[in-house]
């Protein structure tokens, strides 16, 4: 039973970059900046999930959507790992902090596509 409980201190470590929405002044204009999950993928039960996650993350960065995020993110995107209770593996999400206008463009162009 003890192994099934979530280790909240470890989860906090993975989510340390997450912040709420904020407003910034960029080129004399006030823009809203917030976090957005830009890519998700699953991984089976492997010995070192961080090591095995490097390839899918790198492959996504080479896509058109990945290049857009890397160019328009306000700071370096980060990944978050969670346990996947459905298949005893892991779920990874890549999160980026972007302007609201860039988030809208990304959602309209890339969400729901294979890119």
Named regions from a protein language model:
Residues 2-89:
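Structured alpha/beta or helical-core interaction and ligand-binding surfaces enriched in interleaved
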């Amino acid at each position: 039973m003890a192994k099934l409980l979530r280790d909240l201190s470890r989860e906090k470590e993975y989510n340390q970059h997450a912040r709420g929405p904020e407003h910034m002044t960029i080129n004399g204009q006030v823009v809203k900046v917030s976090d957005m999950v830009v890519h998700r993928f699953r991984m089976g039960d492997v010995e070192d999930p961080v090591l095995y996650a490097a390839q899918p993350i790198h492959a996504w960065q080479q896509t058109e959507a990945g290049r857009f995020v890397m160019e328009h993110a306000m700071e370096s995107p980060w990944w978050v790992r969670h346990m996947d209770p459905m298949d005893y593996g892991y779920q990874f999400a890549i999160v980026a902090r972007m302007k609201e206008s860039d988030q809208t463009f990304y959602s309209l162009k890339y969400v729901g596509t294979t890119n």
